[in-house]
A protein has these predicted regions:
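Sec-dependent signal peptide cleavage junction
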Residues: 25-68, 75
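Bacterial N-terminal signal peptides
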Residues: 14-22
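Helix-rich interaction surfaces within compact, conserved domain-sized segments
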Residues: 132-192
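Solvent-exposed coil/turn segments that connect beta secondary-structure elements
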Residues: 79-81, 101-103, 110-112, 150, ...
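N-terminal post-signal-peptidase region of extra-cytosolic proteins
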Residues: 60-61, 78-94
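Single conserved hydrophobic/aromatic residue that forms the stacking wall/gate
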Residues: 1-11
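Mid-length scaffold segments of soluble, non-membrane domains
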Residues: 88-140
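Soluble periplasmic/extracytoplasmic beta-strand elements of cell-envelope proteins
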Residues: 75-77, 97-99, 104-108, 146, ...
Length: 192
């Protein structure tokens, strides 16, 4: 009987060790799950904060761009050109822009080509006076600005659309010297 009582004690101890070990493992799993959930909640909160900051900055940029259009004091710095058949190319905003400064406007397009072009940098520049400036806002908050530029010997019709929620805009240029309508995309910023 002493032997069976000792074996029973060993089994009880083993059962107690197994129960303790499984409880400890479950507690560690629970702690790991809690830490994982905390990290996920922190990441989600950080993403939400960054998204809210980005939306606020975009809204400020949009308001500044709208005011610049109303004041007729802006530059659309194009970083992408969309050709007639839909092909796109990235371009330099230093040489591809539309500027409106009161009654004067400059429309310059220049592509990275080995040919100098009429403006000496591989494209065309129309610099002159504006006429027929019209600014409208649609029901979604997109702002449209249309005007004509009359330069020396050449002119162009300019159609700008500023999308609501940021300062990203597109401009369509219809020059009088050819039928190659160009669409540029970039940021519209106030003229400093």
């Amino acid at each position: 009987q002493g032997y069976s009582s000792a074996a029973s004690d060993v089994y009880k101890r083993q059962a107690l060790v197994l129960v303790s070990a499984s409880t400890l493992m479950y507690a560690q799993e629970s702690q790991r799950d809690i830490r994982r959930a905390d990290r996920k909640a922190q990441r989600d909160a950080e993403r939400a904060r960054l998204k809210a900051e980005e939306q606020a900055a975009d809204q400020v940029a949009y308001q500044q761009a709208v005011q610049a259009i109303k004041d007729k004091q802006f530059v659309l710095e194009a970083d992408q050109v969309i050709f007639k058949r839909g092909q796109t190319a990235f371009v330099s905003s230093n040489t591809n822009f539309v500027m409106l400064n009161g009654q004067r406007a400059t429309v310059q397009v220049a592509f990275n080509t080995p040919y100098p072009g009429p403006n000496g940098i591989g494209g065309v520049t129309v610099d002159g006076t504006t006429s027929d400036v019209k600014v409208t806002t649609d029901k979604r908050g997109n702002v449209n600005c249309n005007f004509s530029v009359q330069g020396i010997g050449i002119s162009a019709q300019v159609f700008i659309t500023l999308t609501n929620g940021g300062n990203n805009a597109t401009v369509t240029i219809n020059p009088n010297f050819n039928s190659n309508t160009l669409t540029l995309s970039g940021n519209l910023v106030p003229l400093n």
